Amino acid sequence: MVKLRLKRCGRKQRAIYRIVAIDVRSRREGRDLQKVGFYDPIKNQTYSNVPAILYFLEKGAQPTETVYDILRKTEFFKEFRISFDKKRKEKQES
């Protein structure tokens, strides 16, 4: 199974995260399938490669909660009515 998750880059005390498509069984710093964006929490900048993200989501990739929140802030899911909210609601009820 493939997930969209964050991969840490940068220096000490100056983290930058890449949004990558990666196999679930790989470590955080493991080999990724493709880089699909980045997130800089200090400058609060994001970049996302929309066609690549859509490709992986159509193939069944699941974003982690953090990646989901980052993409939601960039209004990615408003344009492409993708229903991940059902799963999040079920988690909150449990």
Swiss-Prot record:
Domain of life: Eukaryota
Alphabetized Gene3D superfamilies for the sequence: 3.30.1320.10
SUPFAM superfamilies in the record: Ribosomal protein S16
Single GO molecular function: structural constituent of ribosome
Coarse class of the protein's main subcellular location: plastid
GO biological process, one term: mitochondrial translation
Disulfide partners: none
Cellular compartments annotated: Plastid, Chloroplast
Keywords recorded for this protein, A-Z: Chloroplast, Plastid, Ribonucleoprotein, Ribosomal protein
Gene Ontology CC terms: chloroplast; mitochondrion; small ribosomal subunit
HAMAP family recorded: Ribosomal_bS16
Family: Belongs to the bacterial ribosomal protein bS16 family.
Protein name as it appears in the record: Small ribosomal subunit protein bS16c
Gene: rps16
